[in-house]
Amino acid sequence: MKGRSLNTEDRARLEAAIGYRFAEKERLDRALTHSSARSGRAINYQRLEFLGDRVLGLCVAELLFQTFTDANEGELSVRLNQLVSAESCAKVADELSLHEFIRTGSDVKKITGKHMMNVRADVVESLIAAIYLDGGLDAARRFVLEHWTHRAASADGARRDAKTELQEWAHAKFGVAPKYRTDDRSGPDHDPRFTVTVEVDGIAPETGVDRSKRGAEQVAAMKLLEREGVWQKRSAGN
């Protein structure tokens, strides 16, 4: 959807899909507006995304704390990182068909492929913030629980920390320690993307991308463990 605001029919369809009716319709419009759609720092979803990331983290952390009463802090952190990742948020966006409503500008071609996944994830966080501002924490929590409760139940929390697992596996199999290299940092300060490569002597490296350097290291370690058959690869539905 290039440029234009939601019409009455589209707004009703989207509000029905997300299960929330906005009192201030402009909040929903802003949550769907990519920075390419208009000039001006206050018209797009970037500020909402910043807030929505924190609201999502709080609601999911609360869900995990109440659900997995015997899990320690490390196990809860692994689950949390899985559930609030860009990949998970993008899947929620796909379930809601948010791509049909995202407002973009003339440089829409710049947000295709992997970056488009990040855009879909960002819009979900922006939408959570818009709901929070419009209806309060309870409304935002209801949305998060609707779309993350089943994901929390299926998240592979039995896994250990990927970097720790890779460290022990690499030492036992090759007698070496993994080496991590930061290849790239992109994106604005409030929403960076780190690309990290992990190398273990004797086998091909793997690369991970995440919003934090540590998260990217975890993704790279996880991908290497899955590729080498140390961990079973997660299904696409989780």
From Swiss-Prot:
User: EC number(s) per UniProt?
Assistant: 3.1.26.3
- One Pfam family it belongs to: dsrm
Q: Which residues form the RNase III domain?
A: 11-136
One GO term in the molecular function aspect is: ribonuclease III activity
Tell me, in one coarse class, where this protein mainly resides.
cytoplasm
Task: Name the GO cellular-component terms.
Answer: cytoplasm
Sorted alphabetically, which PROSITE patterns does this protein's record hold? DS_RBD (PS50137), RNASE_3_1 (PS00517), RNASE_3_2 (PS50142)
Boundaries of each DRBM domain copy? 161-230
Reactions that this protein is recorded to catalyse: Endonucleolytic cleavage to 5'-phosphomonoester
What InterPro entries does the annotation carry?
dsRBD_dom, RNase_III, RNase_III_dom, RNase_III_sf
- The active site lies at D53, E125
Q: Which family does it belong to?
A: Belongs to the ribonuclease III family.
What this chain does, per the entry, is described as:
Digests double-stranded RNA. Involved in the processing of primary rRNA transcript to yield the immediate precursors to the large and small rRNAs (23S and 16S). Processes some mRNAs, and tRNAs when they are encoded in the rRNA operon. Processes pre-crRNA and tracrRNA of type II CRISPR loci if present in the organism.
Q: What is this protein called?
A: Ribonuclease 3
Q: Which organism is it from?
A: Rhizobium meliloti (strain 1021) (Ensifer meliloti)
Corresponding gene?
rnc
